[in-house]
Amino acid sequence: MSVQQQQVDLRRTFAIISHPDAGKTTITEKVLLFGQALQRAGTVKGKKSGQHAKSDWMEMEKERGISITTSVMQFPYNDCLVNLLDTPGHEDFSEDTYRTLTAVDSCLMVIDVAKGVEARTVKLMEVTRLRDTPIITFMNKMDRDVRDPMEVMDEVEEVLKIKCAAITWPIGMGKEFKGIYHILDDEITLYQSGLGHMIQEKRVIKGLNNPELDKIIGNYADDLREELELVSGASHDFNLEEFLKGELTPVFFGTALGNFGVDHMLDGLTKWAPKPLPRKTDLREVTAEEEKFSGFVFKIQANMDPKHRDRIAFMRICSGKYEKGMKMKQVRLAKDVKIADAVTFMAGDRSNVEEAFAGDIIGLHNHGSIQIGDTFTAGEMMKFSGIPNFAPEMFRRIRLRDPLKAKQLQKGLIQLSEEGAVQVFRPFINNDMIVGAVGVLQFEVVVQRLKTEYKVDAIYEAISVATARWCTCDDERTLEQFKKKSGDYLALDGGNNLTYIAPTMVNLSLAQERNPDIVFHSTREH
């Protein structure tokens, strides 16, 4: 087996998806703790003490306690090398989260057992369905008062249309939470509260019928045995093939805050989650084992380091090997670039990379020439597909407090739009800058970042825009006529793509009727 093949086999690249406040950032901390990446997990609760969660590093995130940008963290666990992509949990950041899900091979779904399946989880699961991504489930907060675990598993099956296979099962809940039974290993791990910040010495009892169990947890032992009979009747057996097709999810229980049950889930993930999978391009399918390098950019993050005022393009390597100083082709521009200083991340802490393999995420320094969706190869002119832009759902006009800063405003907005934080439209008929987003919080982020990173003081005004559509037409003359006729409603986006800005949905319908040869797109591939 070649060194490259060995390296590919080691890798597991996954993202965590959940509804806000289900405990995603906490579980990220604990996963890193097990990966020895953090000695003491900086729980999100310790905000006032200045001990911020490692994966929430942007100013606004530190203030609010929400993960806005996607962090990437790599750590070793169980003879595997795990790449964890932390996605924004806040519902206003669905586009960024969506794109991150194009860069992973599996997902960990975190569910708050007190609340069950929530809206955001449903939306994210729809996205994973597009590529049938394998899903592992962690039922969180068992040390709180929660709903009946069986009921929540039924809800997952019914709402998310995925079979559940219980791998572990909780003993008690809330204040009476006693531990976890591992169904496949036939062993009980006993829970001790107050030790969430460290890796605990495990107290394990072998065998469900061990009399030791009755001694330690009393009547809970009989309750557990009864429950497990019900579970074996109602739950599905774990089937690796169904899991890899995205049809069945292994379910683990625990408490991320109490750092309990997380290791069971990690064991399952490293054992069952797929190694780097093949990827489609416009020409062919690329496998991770191929020797020649290829990768695509799924995110651009501005100013990760205020000291460096730079931008980093996050690239998922799909095949081959990155080596320091290597040449690669940037397909969109058909030009060769030498990459001498790619970085890996530990959420804001960087280290330079000597080599990286398929499944790894590396950061390229970007001075404006790299865009989301860019493909880099060893020379082949192919493009990875499936990294979409969505038409925004909310719009604002942006105004300067100081008119002399117009140039800085334009530069800042174009950079932020290339990064995918927001979409920018410049109408044909005036000098307005219209900003489009998927949620309100994105607007706040943009104003704050314009201020701190570009020294531009800007405010928003309401604007009557219902939606935007990208316009294309195969016939150049028809397109030119359309531009003349509909100029009042047309704009260019940040990438200079022609866009129809509709004041109402009725207006859009009429425009589509009157211009049957023009295609109005609600999504656009990067």
UniProtKB/Swiss-Prot annotation:
Listed Pfam families: EF-G_D2 (PF22042), GTP_EFTU (PF00009), RF3_C (PF16658)
One GO cellular component term noted in the UniProt record for this chain: cytosol
Domain tr-type G per the UniProt entry, residue ranges: 9-277
Binding residues annotated for GTP, in chain numbering: 18-25, 86-90, 140-143
Subcellular location: Cytoplasm
GO molecular function, one term: GTP binding
GO biological process, one term: regulation of translational termination
The UniProt record lists the keyword Nucleotide-binding: yes
Keywords: Cytoplasm, GTP-binding, Nucleotide-binding, Protein biosynthesis
InterPro entries listed in its UniProt record: EF-G-like_DII, EFG_III/V, G_TR_CS, P-loop_NTPase, PrfC, RF3_C, RF3_dom_3_sf, RF3_GTP-bd
Domain of life: Bacteria
Stated role: Increases the formation of ribosomal termination complexes and stimulates activities of RF-1 and RF-2. It binds guanine nucleotides and has strong preference for UGA stop codons. It may interact directly with the ribosome. The stimulation of RF-1 and RF-2 is significantly reduced by GTP and GDP, but not by GMP.
Family: Belongs to the TRAFAC class translation factor GTPase superfamily. Classic translation factor GTPase family. PrfC subfamily.
Name this polypeptide is given: Peptide chain release factor 3
Native organism: Colwellia psychrerythraea (strain 34H / ATCC BAA-681)
Gene name tied to this protein: prfC
